[in-house]
A protein has these predicted regions:
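Nucleic-acid nuclease catalytic cores
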Residues: 245, 286-306
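Accessory nucleic acid-recognition modules appended to NTPase machines
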Residues: 101-260
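Domain-level recognition of nuclease-like catalytic cores that cleave nucleotide substrates
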Residues: 298-322
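Interdomain motor-coupling "hinge/lid" segment immediately C-terminal to the ATP-binding subdomain
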Residues: 40-42, 46-147, 180-183
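Conserved P-loop NTPase "ATPase switch" module shared by AAA+ and STAND
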Residues: 2-20
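Structural recognition of the conserved hydrophobic beta-strand(s) that form the central parallel beta-sheet
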Residues: 10, 34-40, 61
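Conserved Walker B catalytic segment
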Residues: 14-37
Length: 322
């Protein structure tokens, strides 16, 4: 390391090296070192490391491609519905754009999955049963967008012949969240403006992985869109929660500094009953923050007493003035 000029150091997956927090800290203390550290799980920012580097690092969260990035990467802006179909049936991982056939994509996603499950989760967490972990993964993938508790997951899986207790479910889900394979979204009491401790939702980092895991039964347009919108809000650096308004649910409460926005997500609201159901929870919120219904319907933007119905694809592309 030179003393009279900057030295740029890049570490990838350094969490696999013993005593790596001490290595990072010692280098970070040197005034002529600019240090970049990447890691594929939340252990990189565990309390021990955060304490060592307190106030001296900037965290940049990385995600697979957003829909807009995918469209730009595939040069498919002339047909957004087809681009969206490709986005959810192939994958949002950048490398898959270079792959020609669906079988090649499945092979690649299988490799990603095995790396996360076997090398990252099973090895580091020392979980005892890879088959049970895979059962939890498939159950979670099949229930994206559903309100869940670890007890309910344990009860349903046990009833289906895969006996598992609540503590084991908690341990496995925690491991999945730490590797960013799954994201947990907590509930937020809109009226009381506080987080609730129970009954959140889970979303996958990539819908292509869901299709790989579940096959032909993976297609549920509404829940897939909900997962995609959740990831888009993360791309926009929002803190995202599931909203609770009395007995009603708001799909997403997105908070950014002092700004709040509310979202309902549905594949279509052309049926009047569906539209009224999606409007109902938003109409109960008595504040002036923006409220949206995002849908795949290719209809002009509409306004229902301040609640905007917007095409989700145009919203993700940033083409809609909100």
């Amino acid at each position: 390391i030179l003393q009279d000029r900057m030295t740029y150091i890049f570490f990838d997956e350094i969490q696999h090296v013993s005593d790596f927090p001490d290595i990072i800290n010692s280098l970070n203390l040197k005034p002529t070192v600019d240090l970049y550290v990447t890691g594929s799980n939340a252990y990189m920012l565990s309390s021990e490391i955060a304490t060592l580097l307190s106030g001296r690092y900037i965290e940049i969260a990385m995600l697979p491609l957003s829909f807009k990035e995918y469209v730009e990467g595939t040069d498919s802006s002339n047909n957004l519905p087809q681009a969206y179909t490709d986005y959810i049936t192939r994958s949002s991982f950048p490398y898959t754009i270079e792959l020609g056939t669906y079988s090649e994509i499945i092979d690649y996603l299988t490799g990603v999955y095995n790396t996360i499950v076997v090398k990252d989760i099973m090895a580091r967490k020392r979980l005892p049963d890879v088959m049970m972990l895979e059962s939890v993964i498939r159950f979670t993938a099949d229930n994206i967008g559903n309100i869940l508790s670890t007890k309910r997951i344990a009860d349903i899986m046990t009833a289906d012949g895969r006996k598992i207790d609540q503590k084991t479910v908690e341990r496995y889900l925690s491991a999945l969240c730490e590797t960013f394979f799954v994201y947990e979204t907590k509930r937020y009491n809109i009226k009381g403006k506080q987080l609730l401790k129970t009954l959140g939702k889970y979303y996958l980092v990539d819908i292509g992985l869901r299709r790989m895991l579940l096959g032909s039964r993976s297609f549920d347009a509404g829940r897939i869109l909900e997962n995609i919108v959740y990831l888009e809000l993360l791309h926009r650096q929002k803190k995202v929660y599931v909203g609770k308004m009395d007995s009603l649910e708001v799909d997403f409460v997105a908070i950014d500094e002092n700004n709040i926005s509310y979202y309902q997500v549905a594949a279509t609201v052309r049926d009047e009953t569906t539209l009224q159901r999606e409007l109902a929870s938003l109409q109960q919120i008595n504040d002036q923050y923006p409220k949206y219904i995002l849908t795949l319907d290719e209809d002009p933007t509409a306004d229902y007493d301040g609640i905007k119905r917007v095409n989700a694809l145009r919203w993700m592309m940033g083409d809609v003035s909100l």
